[in-house]
Amino acid sequence: MIRVFIDPQLLIFKMSGHSEFGPVGSDIVCAAATMLASTLVHNMTTRLDESQILERELNSGHAVLKVMPIRRKMRDECRVLFAATLEGFELLAKRYPEHVIID
């Protein structure tokens, strides 16, 4: 099961586990979760200076992202992107509740 924690206010994202929905390399739930996580990490790394990325890890079965934008406007933009990612994971969890859980 994939477990996800996202706090759009604190700008923290954590994901762990495997969905075990299908065979490795053909698992659509895992692919969807990976794309959501990868898109969030990409958006943060292209918008923020390295000094504002407190933690970043994206591996098979594990992802962590913590950011602290300095400017208020950028913080607000990041919160929107974190919230959109949370919404994506909520939709995925609704469709595949045995394979994705939001903490």
Predicted feature residues:
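Short, conserved glycine- and acidic-residue-centered signature motifs
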Residues: 29, 33
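N-terminal intrinsically disordered, cationic/polar leader segments
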Residues: 1-28, 41-103
